[in-house]
Amino acid sequence: MDAMTPPAPEQPRPVSLLPVFLIVLVDVFGMTLVIPLLAIYAESFHATALQATMLVSVYAACQLVSGPVIGHVSDRVGRKPMLLISQVGTFIGFIVMAKARALWMLYVARVLDGATAGNLSLAQAYISDHTEPSQRAKSFGLIGIAFGVGFFIGPSLTGYLSAKYGMTTPIYLAAVMSAISILCTATLLKGGPQSHHAFDDREAALRWRTYAKYFGRPGLRERLLQFLFFITSFSLFISGFALFAERRFTYQGHPFGPREIGYVFGYVGLLGIILQGGLIGRLVKRFGEAALVAAGFVALVIGYFGLGIASSFALLMVAGTLAAFGNGVIRPALTSLITQQAGRQEQGVVLGITQSLMSMASVVAPIVGGLLIERQMLKEWAWAAAGLAAVGVALSREGLPFYATASADSIGTP
């Protein structure tokens, strides 16, 4: 090879992604056991709506600090060691939460979990390490399937267990699932390639400089902004839905509780399984990732707006179906577009940044949502989520058919 010829980029190492799927599935199963009851569990310690949603904000604030650092370190030492550390933190957090005797102990549990959080971004980075760019949307769909299965089984099981045995039982079960995920990672997951890219340690320490670097890249900047608005609307929804539904809807004469909320999440999870289990790959081939992202944001706008005006359980499920479709197609398609825009040696950092964007959104959105719900501004809570998704539509211009047609016409105009 000529001395002046740059070396060919290292190709992804093909490995079975089944262990990653199993690990994410177990992790998500544990997480979804807790999501439907977290806010209502906090209310059992006399928390206000704002104090309940701030449990999400505290977790996210810790995750905001740790996200880029975990990404950098995983690029150097490999994904597996950092994934194990993250999972151990989750396990300890669940144990503390289950044994809590006061509201402040719930906050301690969320700090412990958030400080080591990185399971999802590390799993995504592992998939990027071992798949070709053209296959990533389909491969990231595995994470979507895991979320779907977890959201189908976990919340439904939470509803049953909390009604029959009390609200701490699902939390203990979540800790058991976390322990199983640690064993799966230790025994099933193969070590991935380490990055030989010489990162500047000062850049790793100054996270804002890292953000400026990647947000300064055309193409990648728009995708990261889309991800920010997507995850902000999702965080507003997921952190406040239990409190919203508890105050807005009744079932068989009583307000929504963990059981009913769990069943709604279970339905959304079932839709996710159907969508990402077989449709996402065909949809990407037919329409492309950009078009799917645009369609997903449109569905979110309609779904969240409909949630605000829903006056019956049936209308709630219609709005939830649209929102589930939007979330189901945006996450894998947008993650694929982001990793394609980043260099191979930078994928851990970029996915760490997306994890930090999730954290930033999850710091602010639950506080805003908690304030709105506490003031009984339930419609405004749902419409705020719709407005955030509408910004995602505006940033999806190249994926919208009418924009593509207009662009082609303008190019052809002398």
Summary of predicted features, one role per range:
Residues G67-V77, L275-G288, I373:
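Helix-to-loop junctions at the C-terminal end of transmembrane segments
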Residues P81-V96, A175, A291-F305:
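Structural signature of the two symmetry-related core transmembrane helices
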Residues H46, G78, K99-W104, I309-S311:
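Helix-breaking motifs and short loop linkers at transmembrane-helix boundaries and internal kinks
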Residues A290-L334:
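C-terminal transmembrane helical hairpin of 12-TM major facilitator-type secondary transporters
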Residues T5-P14, G191-L225, P414:
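Juxtamembrane intracellular "pre-TM" segments in multi-pass secondary transporters
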Residues V65-R101:
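Conserved MFS/SLC helix-loop-helix module at the cytosolic interface between two early adjacent transmembrane helices
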Residues A109-G148:
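Cytoplasmic helix-loop-helix junction between adjacent transmembrane helices
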Residues P36-A49, G240-E260:
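Short amphipathic helix-loop junctions that connect adjacent transmembrane helices
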